[in-house]
């Protein structure tokens, strides 16, 4: 009798879990809009086309497209960074082979 009660309890719990995982939670991700954050004269804020490229090549492209960016940093992916916003800085997150692994953006 105890085993039957466990089976029934398991089936009831399993029927509750499936609808919880299948529903859309409608979570909106907030994006920082650089143009509204006080960065005047910014012509381009993100470079998704540079994913997978060598860091030196990406650095040249970014500085050519926006000369106001005087601080282009190469950082190993997962390394510590500050959370402050700087309009003249772009961080290039690279892997051990020095290829871009995250979309470079102003910040």
Swiss-Prot record:
Phylogenetic placement of the source organism: Eukaryota, Viridiplantae, Streptophyta, Embryophyta, Tracheophyta
Alphabetized GO MF terms: serine-type endopeptidase inhibitor activity
Subcellular localization(s) per the UniProt record: Secreted
Superkingdom of origin organism: Eukaryota
A matching Pfam family: potato_inhibit
Protein family (similarity comment): Belongs to the protease inhibitor I13 (potato type I serine protease inhibitor) family.
Primary localization: secreted
Induction, per UniProt: By tobacco mosaic virus infection, wounding, UV light, salicylic acid and ethylene.
UniProt propeptide residues: 23-36
Gene3D superfamilies for the chain: Trypsin Inhibitor V, subunit A (3.30.10.10)
InterPro entries on file: Prot_inh_pot1, Prot_inh_pot1_sf
Protein name, entry field: Proteinase inhibitor I-A
Signal peptide (from-to): 1-22
GO biological process per UniProt: response to wounding
Organism field: Nicotiana tabacum
Key words, A-Z: Protease inhibitor, Secreted, Serine protease inhibitor, Signal
GO cellular component, one term: extracellular region
Marked site (Reactive bond) residue numbers: 83-84
């Amino acid at each position: 009798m105890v085993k039957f009660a466990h089976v029934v309890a398991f089936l009831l719990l399993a029927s509750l879990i499936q609808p919880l995982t299948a529903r859309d939670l409608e979570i909106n991700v907030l994006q920082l809009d650089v143009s509204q954050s006080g960065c005047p004269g910014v012509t381009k804020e993100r470079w998704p086309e540079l994913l997978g490229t060598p860091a030196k090549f990406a650095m040249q492209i970014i500085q050519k497209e926006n000369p106001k960016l005087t601080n282009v940093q190469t950082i190993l992916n997962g390394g510590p960074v500050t959370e402050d916003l700087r309009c003249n800085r772009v961080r290039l997150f690279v892997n051990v082979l020095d290829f871009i692994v995250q979309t470079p953006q102003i910040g």
